[in-house]
Amino acid sequence: MAKLAFENDEVPVGAVVVNNGEIIGRGFNQVIEKNSISSHAEINAINQASQFIKNYRLKNCDIYVTLEPCHMCAKAIVDARLSHLYYGAKEPKTGAIESIDKFLDREDINHHVVFSGGHMKDESSELLKKFFKSKRAKKASQKNLF
């Protein structure tokens, strides 16, 4: 899923929602394509899974994401009542699970999600580095045109 985002010139983050070993929702970043700040991979995967089971509550489902979720996505994961979150690379600037905040550890949230990070982190990090390196190179070449 992250590779699809990369191919579409979006930040390469992908997510899947799984129920009993079956993928019921897939998503990748489509913020630019959809002109929507909420079209993050996690939310797109959650929306697809909710449509699939015809319920916004995804009890007994897990979500796998290539990058540590932001606050918006962490809240969506809680509200969807997902059981487990597995993510790849840490996000030092906006990661709300372990990096800049520990949102899922809060006592006052209405549902607690078990989480684990570092899954396939090298692959996730490499794709992100490649994406941002190409963005910087493109920006530098555009500066040289003027």
At which residue positions do the language-model features occur?
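Small-residue (primarily alanine) positions within well-ordered alpha-helices
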Residues: 2-5, 15, 25, 41, ...
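Short, basic and Ser/Thr-rich N-terminal targeting/leader segments
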Residues: 9-13, 59
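Helix-adjacent hinge/juxtasegments
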Residues: 38-39, 43, 47-80, 84
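Conserved Nudix-box catalytic region and its N-terminal flanking loop in Nudix hydrolases
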Residues: 33-36
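Short beta->alpha transition motifs characteristic of CBS
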Residues: 24-31
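Zinc-dependent deaminase
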Residues: 1-8, 56, 69-146
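Short beta-strand scaffold segments in enzyme catalytic cores
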Residues: 13-21
